[in-house]
């Protein structure tokens, strides 16, 4: 048994259940990015990047729908991991900007979600 499968077992959740939850999370986050890009860019000190945030919203919604609609969500979970890396690469340079505390909070949140995404993708692949 791997550490990841132990964590999931202790939490009382399976990898497919976690994938479904993360799929719904993608839909919610993507919807927020599509509807409230100015709020997000304002929080991060990234005004003027609303178009990019909307594009990321499309990515999140698409990935969420793919996870929820797939009989094999593992590849789509790896898509979430790639999206996490892109998000970190977009947000991290703003640590030196006007709102470093907000950016640090966003990066911590991204790291936590990325850890769940990796754990889920790995466990789904083991279960194939």
Please provide the spans of the model-predicted regions.
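Short amphipathic, positively biased membrane-proximal segments
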Residues: 1-128
């Amino acid at each position: 048994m791997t550490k990841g499968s132990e964590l999931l077992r202790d939490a009382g959740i399976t990898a497919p259940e976690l994938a479904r939850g993360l799929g719904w999370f993608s839909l919610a986050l993507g919807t927020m990015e599509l509807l409230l890009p100015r709020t997000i860019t304002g929080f991060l000190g990234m005004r003027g990047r609303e178009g990019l945030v909307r594009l990321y919203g499309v990515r999140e919604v698409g990935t969420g729908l793919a996870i929820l609609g797939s009989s094999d969500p593992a590849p789509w979970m790896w898509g979430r991991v790639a999206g996490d890396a892109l998000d970190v690469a977009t947000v991290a340079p703003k640590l030196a900007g006007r709102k470093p505390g907000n950016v640090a909070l966003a990066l911590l949140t991204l790291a936590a979600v990325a850890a769940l995404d990796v754990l889920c993708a790995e466990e789904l692949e083991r279960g194939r």
